[in-house]
């Protein structure tokens, strides 16, 4: 299946989609009537479990819809544990001196040269003696294949006991990584993989003979300590994948730390996360001693190729009218429209359909595979407008989006501007050197305040646009 790695056959993708139908997205619990005006109640806040499932499901969705590697323009920043040691990067897999069966496996996956993150990460991960690594890496950058390569490089196939341990936040994400291991290791028939996930029962007293174990923290901890199916002292490589998803569940964080403490001192520790908020950093530093660090440089996240505007309105009907005026005046190839709640998203999609637009709706209650199908249709241009809530659209890349509309401005759970989400939303439009257009709908003093704070944060002026003035709208399209 397409993990965040290589172009694989479409039928494999479809098979994986079918196998994933059990994972559902939880309903957004935070409601807002107008931009950023949030009403919470004791029952309206997301539980940690729901938040984690949102992130885990989002990550899974990215894997299902990813057909190739993302061309990441961010500069990679490398912080070495030992600054005096030479810094290597590679431009080909041959330079890594892999075992022939492993190189064969890499090429069989359709991978011809390392991605940007792999160029820097692989020499560190394959170094002798082994080095620890904390890496920031988005979906689609080839990090799964990178750590699978590291695990397969260190395994002794003749030794029939677990030597590599990989933690994933959910059963479904563990399966995705497992598929990459099976594909890359297919010319190593003696290499075996075990899944340490709930429901996979072994007899008491039994020992795991597979060399690689991938699983969720709770089950892996049981297998290592209580049930003693695995001897943690023999583990050579420990991978903690999707750390930001993992720590959204308190239990997973504690379990991961307990597993790490059972491992030998010379075990190689590799941790990956798409984001590095403070909580992720603290966790990473607890589980990965003396690490090399690979980060994406923040200043690369530029808004220079995107023209940003705001429109003043009094209510959602006026916002809708402004939207119609935009559509009437300029040619929009494809647009993404973000709403704060599912209710608003559903209403807006229905209104746009009545106006004759081909509209796709990404909604929180959809199964992951349904959402993957909606995104594919939008990618193929079958629908020209995608209306979505924030929860659904994190991390989804569609190259031909020319306009992003914030029907509601992004705010965090406390009602403050969510700058990272703003950047992420509008960053979909100014890609690959093209000019993009972002339009923000403002309908209250509060949302004007949010907009002003977003301007200050990015140090970029957002111009006012009068959508009743056709000449003015036509100017912004040029």
Swiss-Prot record:
Q: Superkingdom of the source?
A: Eukaryota
Q: Which residues form a coiled coil?
A: none
- The ranges of region (C-terminal lobe) come to 300-478
- Pfam families documented for this protein: DEAD, Helicase_C
Chain segments carrying region N-terminal helix: 54-67
Region described as Disordered: spans on this chain:
34-53
State if Acetylation is listed as a keyword.
Answer: yes
GO CC, sorted alphabetically, is: cytoplasm; nucleoplasm
The question of whether ATP-binding is a record keyword is answered with yes
Q: In which tissues is it expressed?
A: Found in testis, heart, brain, liver, skeletal muscle, and kidney.
Q: Which residues carry this modification: N-acetylalanine?
A: 2
Catalytic activity reads:
ATP + H2O = ADP + phosphate + H(+)
- Cross-link Glycyl lysine isopeptide (Lys-Gly) (interchain with G-Cter in SUMO2) mapped to chain: 26
The name this protein carries in UniProt is ATP-dependent RNA helicase DDX19A
Q: Which organism is it from?
A: Mus musculus
């Amino acid at each position: 299946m397409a993990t965040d790695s290589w172009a694989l056959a479409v039928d494999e993708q479809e098979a994986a989609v079918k196998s994933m139908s059990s994972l559902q997205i939880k309903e957004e619990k935070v409601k807002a009537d107008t931009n950023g005006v949030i009403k919470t109640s004791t029952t309206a806040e997301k539980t940690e479990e729901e938040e984690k499932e949102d992130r885990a499901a989002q990550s899974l969705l990215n894997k299902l819809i990813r057909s190739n590697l993302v061309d990441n323009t961010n500069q990679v920043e490398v912080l070495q544990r030992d600054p005096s040691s030479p810094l290597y990067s590679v431009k080909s897999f041959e330079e890594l001196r892999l075992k022939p069966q492993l190189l064969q496996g890499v090429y069989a996956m359709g991978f011809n040269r390392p991605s940007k993150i792999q160029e820097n990460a692989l020499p560190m991960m394959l170094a002798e003696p082994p080095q620890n690594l904390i890496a920031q890496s988005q979906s689609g950058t080839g990090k799964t294949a990178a750590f699978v390569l590291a695990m397969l490089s260190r395994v002794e196939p003749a030794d029939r006991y677990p030597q590599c341990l990989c933690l994933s936040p959910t059963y479904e994400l563990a399966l995705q990584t497992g598929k990459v291991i099976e594909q890359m290791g297919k010319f190593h028939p003696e290499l075996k993989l075990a899944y340490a996930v709930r429901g996979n029962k072994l007899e008491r007293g039994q020992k795991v003979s597979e060399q690689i174990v991938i699983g969720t923290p709770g089950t892996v901890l049981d297998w290592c300590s209580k049930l003693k199916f695995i001897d943690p002292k023999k583990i050579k490589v420990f991978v903690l994948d999707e750390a930001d998803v993992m720590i959204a569940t308190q239990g997973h964080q504690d379990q991961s730390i307990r597993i790490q403490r059972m491992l030998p001192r010379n075990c190689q520790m590799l941790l990956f996360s798409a984001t590095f908020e403070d909580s992720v950093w603290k966790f990473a530093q607890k589980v990965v001693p003396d690490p090399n660090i690979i980060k994406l440089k923040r200043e690369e996240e530029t808004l220079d190729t995107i023209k940003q505007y705001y429109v003043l309105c009094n209510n959602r009907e006026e916002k809708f009218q402004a939207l119609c005026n935009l559509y009437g005046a300029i040619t929009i190839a494809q647009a993404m429209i973000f709403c704060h709640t599912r209710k608003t998203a559903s209403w807006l999609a229905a209104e746009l359909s009545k106006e004759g637009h081909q509209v796709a709706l990404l909604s929180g209650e959809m199964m992951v595979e349904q959402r993957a199908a909606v995104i594919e249709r939008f990618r193929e241009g079958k629908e020209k407008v995608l209306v979505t809530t924030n929860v659904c659209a994190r991390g989804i890349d569609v190259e031909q989006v020319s306009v992003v509309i914030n029907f509601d401005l992004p705010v965090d759970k406390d009602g403050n501007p969510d700058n990272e989400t703003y950047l992420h939303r509008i960053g979909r439009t100014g890609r690959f050197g093209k000019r993009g257009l972002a339009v923000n709908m403002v309908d209250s003093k509060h949302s004007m305040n949010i907009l002003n704070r977003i301007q200050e944060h990015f140090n970029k002026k957002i111009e006012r646009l009068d959508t009743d003035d056709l000449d003015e709208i036509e100017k912004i399209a040029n």
